[in-house]
């Protein structure tokens, strides 16, 4: 932060400082030797939020030499372009969608990822769809990683002996960041899904169902699987309560789309209706049981109740302070001054 404000890079560690180089390479080697045989390791990391410089570039060179089969990632080089080959991908934290578009319009030599984005603190993850939609239009944008998955909180008992999830300041420490680490899409403790999880799940689904009044366009974004491996269900809910349910056979090949006629007719009785087309697992998986919903789309419409004429009519009386309305079986007075019922 000091370097960003002052442009004085003497404060940056490790940067180009030779006294730090052996230590950084030792750290890289220790991590490499520990994890090199783990199949889950796809990318080597040179660290996090340490600006740029020669020392981190040498770490990257070490990984490339010892393991040319894997990629190397580092975000800080976006602040120091002298060693742009440090990372095999362009990596930035929390850029706007417009900033990503602008960058790739000038330089698309590398795939672009957000190593952190859509910070999930509090009532967040809004407008996340702008980033996931960008993957459909910008080939070099490869997505991002949400900070964070689980609230960084721990169990603590209140004065009544009841457990709760505690965070900064709950132990009397000052200064503190308070709830800054309560930034997950899953709650701490029992790992229940927060309301943010629903938004994330919807944006990450690999099947898009664009539902209209009488049809649904199914867009299969999966690379390898047909939609026929899932059960497709169609439900109609009236004022929030499901009143009809049926199935729909789909067979959309990977990376293609098909439009199907909805098997349920449009409702005629007054009310608000939600038509939902959803896809579910047919059988148990390691990560979810049969019936688990993997994707859905929805269309909402209203059937208005016919308007009834008032045979006796109504009388409106206006004054300086109030407006009165009188009918056959009612009287009501509105305040002009306060804008409400009197």
For the regions a language model picked out, list residue spans one by one.
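Hydrophobic residues positioned within well-ordered beta-strands of beta-sheet architectures
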Residues: 214-216, 232, 260-262, 275, ...
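A short, sequence-level motif marking secondary-structure junctions
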Residues: 94, 250-252, 335-341
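Beta-strand-rich N-terminal accessory domains
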Residues: 276, 281, 304-342
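Short, well-ordered beta-strand segments enriched in hydrophobic/aromatic residues
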Residues: 215-220, 325, 329
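Intrinsically disordered, low-complexity Pro/Gly/Ser/Thr-rich segments with frequent PxxP/GP/PP motifs
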Residues: 230-232, 237-270, 279
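Terminal connector regions
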Residues: 267-306
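Extended substrate-binding grooves/exosites of carbohydrate-active enzymes
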Residues: 1-215, 221-228, 233-242
């Amino acid at each position: 932060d000091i370097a960003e404000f002052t442009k004085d890079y003497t404060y940056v560690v490790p940067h180009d400082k030779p006294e730090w180089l052996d230590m950084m390479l030792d750290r890289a080697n220790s991590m490499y030797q520990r994890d090199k045989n783990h199949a889950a390791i796809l990318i080597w990391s040179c660290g996090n939020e340490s600006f740029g410089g020669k020392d981190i570039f040498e770490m990257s060179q070490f990984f490339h030499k010892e393991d040319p089969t894997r990629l190397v990632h580092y975000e800080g080089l976006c602040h120091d372009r002298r060693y742009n080959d440090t990372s095999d991908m362009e990596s930035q934290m929390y850029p706007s969608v417009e900033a990503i578009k602008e960058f790739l319009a000038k330089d698309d030599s590398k795939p672009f990822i957000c190593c952190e984005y859509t910070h999930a603190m509090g009532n967040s993850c809004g407008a996340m769809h702008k980033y996931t939609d960008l993957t459909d239009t910008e080939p070099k944008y490869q997505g991002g990683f949400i900070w964070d998955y689980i609230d960084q909180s721990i169990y603590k008992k209140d004065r009544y002996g009841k457990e709760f999830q505690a965070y900064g300041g709950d132990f009397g420490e000052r200064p503190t960041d308070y709830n800054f680490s309560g930034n997950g899409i899953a709650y701490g403790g029992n790992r229940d899904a927060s309301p943010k999880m629903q938004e994330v799940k919807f944006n990450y689904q690999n099947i898009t169902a664009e539902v209209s009044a009488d049809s649904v366009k199914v867009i299969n974004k999966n690379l390898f699987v047909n939609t026929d491996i899932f059960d497709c269900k169609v439900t109609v809910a009236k004022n929030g309560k499901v009143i009809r349910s049926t199935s729909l056979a789909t067979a959309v090949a990977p990376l293609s789309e098909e439009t199907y006629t909805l098997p349920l007719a449009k409702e005629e009785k007054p009310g608000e209706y939600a038509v939902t087309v959803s896809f579910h697992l047919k059988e148990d998986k390691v990560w979810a049981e049969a019936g688990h919903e993997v994707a859905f789309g929805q269309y909402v419409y209203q059937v208005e109740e016919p308007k009834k004429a008032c045979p006796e009519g109504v009388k409106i009386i206006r004054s300086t302070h109030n407006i009165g309305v009188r009918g056959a079986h009612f009287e009501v007075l509105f305040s002009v001054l306060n804008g409400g019922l009197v």
